Regions:
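S-adenosylmethionine/decaboxylated-SAM
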Residues: 1-160
Length: 160
């Protein structure tokens, strides 16, 4: 099997999908639409991670809530990966408040050191991300729907 020396942590809103039986996998029932619940999970976890993959609900608010909370749980030099980063552009129900600031726009603002406001990320969290994201890059997906690539992935590297 892959990564035989690794430990895996999985968080899911659907308790019926939490069905892995392995000493290497710890599972948590979590509502990622609740910033408080995600903060509680981050505080509960006494681990820091080499890789964190956000392949959760694809709701824009959930992606933006999770990023600053769980990016802090990365080891130095670790990677935070967000899958299907633009699905909310096609599926409007994934952005019910019609938030204009997308994860890609946030990364570009951070890179250019431009000030911005977010309904989901506090100013303190923005400053933390500015100081701690070393680099990011995109991997183009192949799933196109209504002229939008909905399967792009972004990789964020934490400072060493």
């Amino acid at each position: 099997y892959y990564f035989p020396n690794s430990k895996l942590f999985a968080a899911n809103i659907n308790p019926f999908q939490l069905k892995y039986f392995s000493k290497r996998i710890r599972e948590f029932y979590v509502d990622v639409s609740s910033k408080k619940t995600m903060r509680n999970l981050a505080e509960y976890l006494d681990e820091y991670f080499d890789v964190i993959i956000d392949d959760a609900s694809h709701n824009l608010s959930d992606i933006l809530y999770a990023l600053p909370i769980f990016f802090k749980k990365l080891k130095k030099g670790g990677y935070y990966i967000i899958e299907d980063i633009d699905q909310f552009k096609v599926f409007k129900n994934l952005n019910p408040k019609n938030e204009k600031l997308t994860p890609i726009m946030i990364l570009k603002n951070l890179e250019k050191n431009q000030k911005f406001d977010s309904n989901y990320i506090s100013n303190d969290e923005i400053e933390y991300l500015k100081k701690n994201i070393k680099d990011y890059y995109f991997e183009k997906g192949e799933m196109i729907l209504n002229d939008h690539n909905i399967s792009d992935i972004v990789f964020l590297k934490k400072n060493v």
